[in-house]
């Protein structure tokens, strides 16, 4: 009961902050939020380990004047009609973790990379005539790379891409490509370039002088044009979500819903526990061919999925 009371207090405090989002942009309010969270959680080990760098903006800390990262400016986009505003279709596949482990080991890869490879395979087979490259945005947690602890966001999207015009790709070819791409891109040196590209515009004096409300109005359009224009879709893998054992009996499973995007239209989010992997598709269209093809592909390889949706 004490633990539940603490959680409720945190939720209510978060709602209070949410009412004045602009005020939360102020570092003093942000600091107040995290101090209140620590007070309510007590001696939580994760919070304790994060105390040193909890308010540090690590993007600024690691920004160096290096050459800018080169990315694809215009990716292939799914030719589907968007649903009416307010609709977001979710398809979740609950999969036994052992069956995925067995299959991914056949290719000498991880479960996350195997699922990403299958996603690429489905898109390449379905859109083999795509003129622009098929690009999947994959967020990487930089806190692990730079060995940092912070409450603030610190991630960068990497953008593996495959040119469908080069011909058909086997799953093995895609996995080999991703192994090489990840080995090259997931390094501190490469992320310095990514951080510089992301942060450099924010150092512009003109942009700094623009009032917050105006930024709030135009930033979504800028992000859509300069950011997600270069993605076909997104793939986020949170990995294993660990919960205190005393709470496990109250949980039926997990969901990780990827944020909707008019440009990408369909995204995938993956989260796991010790027994199952939960593959979640977020879809802003009424076309479910990609989701169907994905789970059918796994089923043909002996990987069964329990499918749950919010639209049937």
Range-by-range predicted roles:
Residues 4, 34, 52, 56, ...:
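Alpha-helix initiation and N-capping motif
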Residues 44-47, 54-66, 113-126, 233-245:
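Charged, low-complexity, helix/coiled-coil-prone segments
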Residues 3-6, 10, 177:
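Alpha-helical scaffold elements adjacent to nucleotide-binding pockets in ATP/GTP-utilizing enzyme cores
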Residues 6, 32, 36, 50, ...:
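Amphipathic alpha-helical recognition patches that constitute DNA-binding helices
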Residues 8, 115, 309-311:
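Short loop/turn and capping residues at structural boundaries
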Residues 12-25, 92, 101, 124-312:
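Acyl-thioester-dependent acyl-group transfer interface
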Residues 10-89, 94, 144:
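Short amphipathic alpha-helices and their capping loops
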Residues 1-5, 90-128, 279, 288-289:
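Acyl activation and transfer enzymes in specialized metabolism, enriched
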């Amino acid at each position: 009961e004490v633990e539940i009371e603490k959680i409720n207090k945190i939720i209510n405090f978060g709602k209070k902050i949410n009412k004045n989002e602009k005020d939360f942009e102020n570092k003093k309010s942000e600091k107040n939020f995290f101090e209140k969270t620590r007070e309510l959680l007590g001696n939580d080990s994760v919070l304790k380990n994060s105390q040193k760098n909890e308010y540090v903006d690590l993007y600024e800390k690691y920004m160096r004047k290096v050459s800018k990262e080169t990315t694809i400016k215009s990716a292939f986009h799914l030719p589907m009609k968007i649903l009416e505003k307010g609709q977001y279709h979710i398809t979740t596949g609950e999969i036994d973790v052992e069956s995925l482990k067995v299959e991914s080991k056949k290719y000498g890869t991880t479960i996350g990379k195997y699922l990403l490879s299958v996603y690429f395979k489905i898109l390449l087979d379905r859109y083999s005539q795509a003129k622009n490259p098929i690009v999947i945005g994959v967020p990487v947690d930089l806190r692990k790379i730079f060995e940092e602890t912070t409450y603030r966001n610190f991630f960068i999207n990497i953008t593996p891409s495959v040119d469908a015009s080069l011909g058909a790709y086997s799953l093995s070819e895609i996995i080999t490509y991703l192994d090489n791409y990840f080995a090259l891109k997931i390094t501190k040196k490469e992320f310095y370039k990514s951080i510089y590209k992301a942060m450099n515009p924010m150092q512009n004096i003109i942009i700094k002088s623009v009032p917050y409300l105006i930024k709030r109005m135009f930033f979504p359009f800028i992000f859509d044009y300069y950011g997600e224009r270069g993605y076909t879709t997104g793939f986020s893998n949170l990995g294993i979500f660990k919960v205190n054992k005393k709470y496990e009996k109250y949980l039926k499973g997990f969901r990780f819903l990827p944020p909707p995007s008019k440009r990408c239209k369909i995204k995938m989010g993956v989260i796991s526990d010790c027994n199952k992997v939960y593959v979640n598709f977020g879809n802003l269209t009424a076309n479910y061919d990609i989701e169907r093809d994905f789970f059918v592909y796994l089923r043909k390889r002996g990987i069964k999925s329990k499918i749950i949706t919010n639209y049937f």
